[in-house]
Amino acid sequence: MKLAKLGVSAAAAAAALLIAAPALAHTKVVKSTPAAQATVAAPKTITLTFNEKVVPAFSSFELVMVGHDMKIPVKTTVSKDNKTISGSPTAPMMAGAYKIKWTAASADGHRMKGEVPFRVR
């Protein structure tokens, strides 16, 4: 009898984990232009594509030149499908190392942050 109750409890716990698993997923970048660690000519447009829809009001990125802590102004927009954030630098980009520092909120309100490093030749 105790063994049967234990089996039912284990099955219920496993079912709860399976149901909760999608809620534990976090917003993350699945593709970027420029790609992480790439060396490129100064990009005219920067794009970040996410694994799930993001909330436009709480999702954007900034462009920072590493070592100088110099921010390059970028006005970002979110695509109609809410999975891609794009932006064009409004100032010239010198040769050197950069980071795309992003923040994105998913539909459940959970905010994530990350960086995509790249170099301009």
Task: Give names to the regions the model predicted.
Residues 103-107:
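Beta-strand-rich extracellular modules
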Residues 91-95:
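Surface-exposed, short loops/turns at beta-strand junctions within beta-sandwich domains
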Residues 24-42:
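N-terminal edge beta-strand
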